[in-house]
Amino acid sequence: MITIIGNSVAGIGAIEAIRKVDKQRPITVISKEPYVAYGRPVISDFLKGKAKEEKLLSYRRKDFYKENNVNLVLNEEIVDIDVKKKKVISASGNEYKYSKLLIATGGVPFIPPFKGKDLKNVFTFTTLDDAKKLLSISKDIKKAVVIGGGLIGLKSAEGLHAQGVKVSIVELMDRILSLAFDKVSGSIVENRMSDVGIDVYTEASTEEILDDGQGNVRGIRLKGGREIEGDIVVIAIGVVPNASFAKKAGIEMNRGILVDDHMETNIKGIYAAGDVAEAKQFLYEQKMLLPIWPDAYKQGRVAGYNMIGIERVYDGGLAMNSIELFGVSTISAGAHTPQNPEGYEFLIDVDEKRYRYRKITLKDNKVVGFIFVGDIDRAGIFVGLIKDKVDVSSFKDKLLKKDFGFIDLPCE
């Protein structure tokens, strides 16, 4: 009996790997949400009104679970693992046995202990239900404050803006998307957001969510005393691995659940994959959280094969972010902005007026990272250069050319 906790992309990857080889082994999938697997990256399209719920829920065929002989249990949250008896226990007291277990529970919103965080009309934005709540209330409000200028914050802001809401974004760092952008690219996207009417406050620390005296939100107060009005507040500072129950069971954790190259934890027969897992990072072969959709699927497949005795090795993920904001496409990957720039080389082409920026980061004549804004064509080639550790010294002068392509690569 294989039991999978979590019903998103990593769990789906595991199911498909298992069923490719073994059509009969019992699989139970347990999810605390009421939905079949859906495309979490596109909940922002739902909020914008560009995607219906049916589209989100079509990540896999309607009969996917039946066709793959999967016992799907919805609205059931697992809160404990009994390692000795090989069973998991839900909040409602139900027990599910396993011979092999995959933890694919993803992440949960990180909520700092702000005063006022429990007021009415304080939201998060990581699930379809979150998007439904924001879409519903957007028709009755005029202003929103989004705390956090990362991917989740910007996509929630874009969705609310599309519904006619005046949005203010508050970000602690000196730029939005601080993990994906450097200062120049962050500034370009900030300018685009300002052009469409979104206010962006960087290097701004939220001190309190303000009460209107009736238990409702009226805005936030920053350190220093400045107040920003809002009928709702979206807390979008980031996510943390949803793994407290795993820690209780003795599973080793750092920031996430630590796994080996087979996606197995320190407890034999228990695996982890996706946003909850801390796995090998490709570039430096160190373990880290990589909350990236394709990598979560890949990790799930590796775990699935290994759970049925077919050895597969996870070769590591690459930090990568791809996002379109208000018509400006962006993608970044790898170590594009190292903290210590010594020993690195940077190739840069920028046109801020046209919202365009290309930065390629090299070390020892190898591409280790890049940021593209506005023009993201051929990004896949650069991902390949990073993963294959190609020496680019013979064609380095061509890397920034608009028509750079496979024809420019060495033949061998």
Where do the PLM segments sit?
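Mid-to-C-terminal Rossmann-like scaffold of FAD/NAD(P)H-dependent oxidoreductases
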Residues: 7, 20, 276-378
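Short hydrophobic core segments
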Residues: 5, 96-106, 147, 228-238, ...
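Beta1-alpha1 glycine-rich phosphate/pyrophosphate-binding loop at the start
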Residues: 1-71, 157-180, 377, 381
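A Rossmann-like FAD-binding core segment of flavoenzymes
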Residues: 24-26, 66, 72-90, 96, ...
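Residue-level detector of alpha-helix initiation sites
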Residues: 8-12, 34, 107-109, 128-129, ...
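FAD-site-proximal beta/loop scaffold in flavoenzymes
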Residues: 118-139, 211-221, 226-302, 394, ...
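C-terminal catalytic lobe of FAD-dependent flavoproteins
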Residues: 1, 218-220, 226-252, 328-410
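Glycine-rich dinucleotide-binding loop and its adjacent helix/turn
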Residues: 105-163
